């Protein structure tokens, strides 16, 4: 279970292990922070699908769409010193993919500076129909 740091917002994350290939995928589509337990889980995974909902903490209020920040809704924004991009830089997981991306997030715009920042960090941007293959069967 993942808890937001600002208010009582709870989410769920899953770790899935393929016992044939001994590969592991962790799915955390809504996370307000990356604590040590989650960091260890990421480090022990071959692939992580992580919360890519918002680029900035004030994304919706700044667009006049709502009043709550990303973190108030249980989402760690990608940008900023404490954002997920910064925190994921030191996590050595082989494959990192942002999922659960809000339609206001500029990483969805091809060739946007935000998308290029994500790609340059070696993190993939999930899309409809994405297929993930983990490991090779013996």
Name these PLM-found stretches.
Residues 4-13, 20-24, 31-130:
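Cap/insert and terminal regions of metallo-dependent hydrolase folds
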Residues 136-138:
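Short, surface-exposed amphipathic charged segments that create phosphate/polyanion-binding patches used
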């Amino acid at each position: 279970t993942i808890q937001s740091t600002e208010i009582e917002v709870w989410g769920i994350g899953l770790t899935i292990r393929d016992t044939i290939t001994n590969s592991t995928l962790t799915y955390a589509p809504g996370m307000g922070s990356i604590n040590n337990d989650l960091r260890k889980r990421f480090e022990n995974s071959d692939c992580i699908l992580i919360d890519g909902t918002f680029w900035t903490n004030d994304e919706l209020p700044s667009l006049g769409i709502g009043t709550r920040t990303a973190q108030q809704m249980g989402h760690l924004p990608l940008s900023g010193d404490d954002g997920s991009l910064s925190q994921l830089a030191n996590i050595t997981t082989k494959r990192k993919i942002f999922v659960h991306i809000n339609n206001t997030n500029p990483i969805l715009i091809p060739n946007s500076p935000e998308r290029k920042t994500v790609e340059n960090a070696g993190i993939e941007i999930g899309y409809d129909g994405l297929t993930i293959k983990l490991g090779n069967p013996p």
